[in-house]
Regions:
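Short hydrophobic beta-strand motif reused across regulatory alpha/beta modules
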Residues: 28, 125-128
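Core segments of cupin and vicinal oxygen chelate
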Residues: 9-49
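Short glycine-biased active-site loop of nucleotidyltransferases that positions the nucleotide triphosphate
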Residues: 39-42, 58-60, 106-107
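Short clusters of small/polar residues that mark proteolytic maturation junctions
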Residues: 34, 53, 128-129
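Short, solvent-exposed beta-strand edge segments and adjacent coil->beta transition regions
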Residues: 3-7, 63-67, 112
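Short beta-strand/turn micro-motifs at beta-sheet edges
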Residues: 52-58
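Vicinal oxygen chelate
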Residues: 13-16, 69-124, 132-136, 143-151
Length: 151
């Protein structure tokens, strides 16, 4: 029945600035509606992001309402800190890890490598990549440490 997640929405204070920001991440603008709503493709015809202009973007942050994670390749993730900085975006601390490189959160047979950053309105964003966990590691660590252990 369910094939995937088609759309998600975030509140923004300046629609044009947010369109520029998300276009800079590689999303493609599809259309706008009455200068208050924009839809950008994450993956054409598969998933998109709706940006709603709002006077109430200062909602208290909670990851269940203002968080989007974009799936990226492992190679893309490895380059993500410099890629974000080159675009003028600032990676941020998350789960106690400084944004010097992606970090890994392990689960049983797999793990997620990730880096976090915010959009101009403070919406929480991340680049994430699912990776194998052949040694069933349970500790969180930086990706470079993970790769050293899993050589």
């Amino acid at each position: 029945m369910i094939k995937g997640l088609y759309e998600a929405h975030l509140p923004v204070s300046d629609l044009d600035r947010s369109i520029d920001f998300y276009s800079g991440l590689g999303l493609k603008l599809d259309h706008t509606f009455e200068d208050r709503l924009a839809f950008l493709w994450i993956e054409k015809d598969k998933s998109w992001l709706g940006l709603w202009k709002s006077d109430r973007v200062e909602l208290e942050y909670h990851p269940s309402i203002r968080h989007i994670a974009f799936q990226v390749s492992l190679e893309g993730l490895k380059n993500s800190v410099s890629w974000l900085k080159n675009k003028g975006y600032k990676p941020r601390e998350a789960f106690g890890f400084e944004p010097i490189e992606p970090f890994v959160m392990p689960h049983d047979n797999y793990a997620h490598a990730k880096i976090h950053f915010n959009d101009p309105d403070g919406n929480s964003l991340e680049f994430i990549c699912k990776i194998d966990n052949p040694n069933k590691i349970t500790n969180r660590m930086y990706l470079s440490e993970w790769e050293e252990i899993n050589k």
